[in-house]
Amino acid sequence: MNAKASSKSIFIQVNTKIQLAPSRLRFVGLSFLRGLIQYVALRPMPQLPFLLLDAFTTQPLRGNPCAVVLDADALTPATRQQLAREFNQSETAFVNRATPGSTEFVVRFFTPAEEIPLAGHPTIATVAALLHTGQVALPADGTPLVLTLDLLHGPIRVDVQPTIGSEPPLVWMTQRRPVFGAIHAPEDVLPIFGLTPDDLLPGASIQTVSTGTPQLMLLLRDHAALRRAYVADPEALGRYRAASDFFSPHLFCLGGATPTGHTFARHFGTPPDISEDPVTGSATGGMAAYLWHHGYINSPNFIAEQGHDMGRAGTVQVRVSGPRTAIETVQIGGTAVVVLEGSLRAEL
C-alpha cells in the first residue's frame, strides 16, 4: 500500500498483511491509512543540519566556500559522495555527532570526485561551524580552545584563538609532517598549463610535497607567469595525475597579491572537481614546506594569498617549525564566516 499526503510532502510506504473479510477490508484499510498519515504528519521529520561557510576570509562571498554537514553518522560513504557532488564545492565536510562537551570530532572530507585524507579550508570551516552551532565554545578565560579532528588517516590538532572585537576566531590547523616526493620534468608538466621553462623561477624544481595531501608544487617566475597559466589540456592533466604521485597542482610565486602578502597562488583541478580552487589550505601547507626547505623564504612565518583574481580573495597565515632540512610542523591559520544554514532530509 502506498499513500501520499501532498499537503505536507509526506511519503509513506506500508507493507503489512491484513486478514479480514473482503467487506471490511476497504473500511479498515482506509481507517488505518488515515491514522497513520495523521501520526506521521504530527511527528517532526528528522533532518541533518548543514552550513555553507566561506573560509580564509572575514567577509562573506570571499575566500573558499565549503559545505559542512553535521550529525552525519548515518550517512554511508556512497551517500556522502553523492552529497559532495550535489553541493558541488571543492570539498564538503561531514561531522559525526560527539558527546556534549567533547573536544574530539570524527570528520571526513569529500571532493565531488572522491574522499581525501586532509583538507585545509574544510578544517577551518568545520571548526567555525562547530563554534557557530554551539557544539564547542571558546574558554571564558581567553585561552585558546584545543580540538582534535579524527580524519581518514588519523587525528590532527586544531587550536582556536579568540580575536579582538567582532572578528571571527582564528583557527590554526596543524598539518602532517612534510613528505617530499618526486621531482617532475618541466617539459612534461609546463605545457599542461600553457607555460614554458622560462616561466619557472630559475633553479626551482617541480616537486610533489605532502603535508597530508600530496600536491604538485610549481614555483613560477612572477605574477605575470602565474596569471598566464591555465589548464591547456584537461585530459593531459588527468592522465599525468593518474600516473603520478600527486592529487592536484599548486602554482605560485613570491610576492603577494596585496602589499601584506608574501606569496600568491593558484590551484587547478580536473573534472568532476572544480576547475580552480579559490584558496587551498592543504596545498598552502605543502607550499610552505617547499619554500622553507629549499630556502626561498627567509622567515618561517608568512602570509599566503590566493583567489584575488577570481573575486574570492583569501588570506592564509602560515607557520613552519623546525630547521629547513628537518621540518617538524606546518600550521595554517584562517577565519571563516557562515553564509547559509539549512537542513537535509534524513532519508537520504
Region locations from a protein language model:
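Short alpha-helix boundary/capping segments
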Residues: 1-10
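Cationic, low-complexity basic patches in intrinsically disordered or flexible, solvent-exposed regions
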Residues: 9, 20, 39
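Intrinsically disordered, low-complexity proline-rich regions
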Residues: 16, 23-26, 31-34
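Short, positively charged and aromatic/hydrophobic N-terminal segments
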Residues: 26, 38-41
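N-terminal, positively charged, Ser/Thr/Ala/Gly-biased leader segments
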Residues: 45-62
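Glycine/serine-rich anion-binding loops at beta->alpha junctions
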Residues: 60, 107-131, 265, 273-288
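Acidic, low-complexity central loop/insert segments
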Residues: 82, 103, 110-240, 292-346
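Conserved phosphate-donor
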Residues: 88-106, 235-273, 302-325, 329
